[in-house]
């Protein structure tokens, strides 16, 4: 009579592999997540009416993007990228800086 192969070594190997995968997954879950590794603004507009804007966020150049990005959030919740070189956008940024320095 032929003897059946002992499944214990295979089962033990599979269990060890599963433990390693779970441990690696938990470690990766605690790692910080980078939002974007590229520029967010692919197209820009020259300006937008101030009464439609809720807030403005200016992101300086960095490792993620080599250009300054100006992102306006409208009252509707939509985000619009503004051209930082446009005269109207420069006025908006100056106004923001003046308000921040006066506070």
From Swiss-Prot:
Signal peptide span: 1-30
InterPro entries, A to Z: Chemokine_b/g/d (IPR039809), Chemokine_CXC (IPR001089), Chemokine_CXC_CS (IPR018048), Chemokine_IL8-like_dom (IPR001811), CXC_Chemokine_domain (IPR033899), Interleukin_8-like_sf (IPR036048)
Major location (coarse): secreted
Keyword check for Glycosyltransferase: no
Molecular function via GO: chemokine activity; growth factor activity
Matching Gene3D superfamilies: 2.40.50.40
One CC-aspect GO term: extracellular space
Bridged cysteine pairs (disulfide): 39-65, 41-81
Record flagged with keyword Electron transport: no
Subcellular location as annotated: Secreted
BP GO annotations: immune response; inflammatory response
Entry keyword set: Cytokine, Disulfide bond, Growth factor, Inflammatory response, Secreted, Signal
Function: Has chemotactic activity for neutrophils.
Family the entry assigns: Belongs to the intercrine alpha (chemokine CxC) family.
Protein name: Growth-regulated alpha protein
The organism of origin for this protein: Ovis aries
